[in-house]
Amino acid sequence: MLSCRLQCALALLSIALAVGTVSAAPSDPRLRQFLQKSLAAAAGKQELAKYFLAELLSEPSQTENEALESEDLSRGAEQDEVRLELERSANSNPALAPRERKAGCKNFFWKTFTSC
């Protein structure tokens, strides 16, 4: 009977200690500061991750814009060249009529047959 009372007393004492330590844990100022810092750091990491994600998403659009600009410049240069060729051909002597080719005519030129 004595051992049963002793076991109950020890069980109640251990439960009381467990409840006391659990209720006392959040009131520890160092632990509270640590938790607040870790939450702030987690929020900062999320913001940092969002920032890097936005940077990564904007990089392809920037490179696409640069590629489009370079294509526009090359197209403009090609158009200028075509315009200059047209002006030269208009100002020069009348062009000779292109050689008329017969159907099925083949010439031997540099080891191969070419059509006329």
UniProtKB/Swiss-Prot annotation:
GO cellular component: extracellular space
GO MF, one example: hormone activity
Localization (cell): Secreted
Annotated region (Disordered), positions in chain: 60-82
Composition-biased stretches (Basic and acidic residues): 72-82
Function, in words: Somatostatin inhibits the release of somatotropin.
Name of the featured protein: Somatostatin
